């Protein structure tokens, strides 16, 4: 479904508190990176292939950019609107399936029309070699927003639905998403701001998720491919709009916080140590490790969804590289 205006208003109010207050140094030359083309790029999610090739999405432009290894240029790889896509959010390289997974959503009611008129929320799969669309799966239900995803050991894809307390699953070879887990623990705030967001597997085989507006961090026990106990973990400090989450091995992760930082996340039992790697980033929305480097998308989404209030974005749009041990 398209996002209702009350949802949009409450979302924007929560999403960009802090991001709008970032100092100008967030856009200064202390960070390197890859410039994205145009004055309307607004990168949202970023993923990487094993060879270091980057893929970047955009809710404003749609489609997917590709950045080849050792290159400082982003090229259009998936054309905006291709394979009935619209505004693009989460992206994930699935090496085993040779696919790039892409979340496609309709943000027209938020004043972001996207490159097509396709309504609804979809998970799309594109051939990593050719860029050809291969898989299209509509999110089930009425309240749907495809946000982010992770691949399980058996090749199943697990997807967060940010408008319902659901983790969805797409089994290998299937084109139909199913509700793998639905639980009140993941409920959105009363005003309807986004709930489930980042998702990753830990070295213990369990699933870890965060909630954007509430700033919670959960472990979902997984046994035999089925969900078990849900545990709300205890971060060492409050989380500020936690977003993209990626594993770095064992019980360690990296995470983007919309409040302006990218973090190292270490899970020890029910405790979560949050260590800021880099702050004063321009509205980070996603992060992916490539070797000892973190690539982070500077979303600047307040300037897209609240243009009148926030004014024009800081150009150029970028994805930035941050040393893992910064």
Sequence positions of predicted segments:
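Bacterial N-terminal signal peptides that target proteins for export
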Residues: 2-15
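A short beta-strand motif characteristic of beta-propeller blades
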Residues: 30-36, 73-81, 132-139, 178-190, ...
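Beta-propeller blade signature
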Residues: 118-129, 311-325
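Beta-rich, blade/repeat-based domains predominating
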Residues: 37-53, 59, 82-108, 139-157, ...
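Short loop/turn segments that connect beta-strands within beta-propeller blades
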Residues: 68-72, 127-132, 171-175, 221-226, ...
């Amino acid at each position: 479904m398209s996002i209702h205006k009350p949802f949009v208003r409450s979302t924007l109010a929560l999403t960009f508190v802090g991001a709008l207050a970032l100092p100008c140094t967030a856009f200064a030359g202390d960070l390197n990176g890859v410039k994205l083309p145009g004055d309307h790029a607004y990168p949202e999610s970023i993923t990487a292939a094993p060879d270091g090739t980057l893929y970047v999405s955009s809710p404003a432009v749609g489609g997917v950019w590709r950045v080849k290894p050792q290159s400082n240029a982003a090229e259009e790889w998936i054309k905006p609107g291709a394979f009935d896509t619209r505004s693009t959010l989460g992206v994930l390289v699935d090496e085993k399936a040779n696919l790039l997974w892409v979340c496609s959503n309709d943000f027209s009611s938020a004043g972001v029309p996207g490159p097509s008129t396709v309504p609804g929320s979809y998970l799309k799969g594109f051939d990593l070699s050719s860029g050809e669309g291969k898989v299209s799966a509509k999110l089930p239900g009425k309240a749907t927003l495809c946000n982010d995803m992770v691949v399980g050991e058996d090749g199943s894809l697990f997807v967060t639905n940010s408008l319902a307390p659901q983790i969805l699953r797409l089994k290998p070879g299937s084109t139909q998403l199913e509700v793998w887990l639905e639980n009140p623990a993941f409920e959105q705030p009363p005003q309807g701001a986004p709930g489930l967001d980042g998702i990753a597997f830990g070295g213990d085989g369990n699933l870890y998720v965060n909630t954007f507006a509430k700033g919670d961090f959960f472990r979902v026990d997984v046994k035999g491919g089925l969900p078990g106990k849900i545990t709300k973990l205890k971060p060492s400090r409050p989380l500020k709009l936690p977003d993209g989450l990626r594993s770095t091995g064992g019980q360690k992760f990296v995470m983007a916080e919309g409040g302006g930082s990218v973090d190292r996340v270490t899970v020890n039992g029910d405790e979560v140590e949050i260590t800021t790697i880099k702050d004063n980033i321009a509205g980070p929305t996603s992060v992916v490790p490539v070797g000892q480097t973190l690539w982070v998308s500077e979303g600047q989404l307040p300037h897209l969804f609240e243009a009148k209030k926030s004014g024009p974005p800081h150009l150029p749009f970028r994805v930035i590289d941050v040393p893992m041990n910064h």
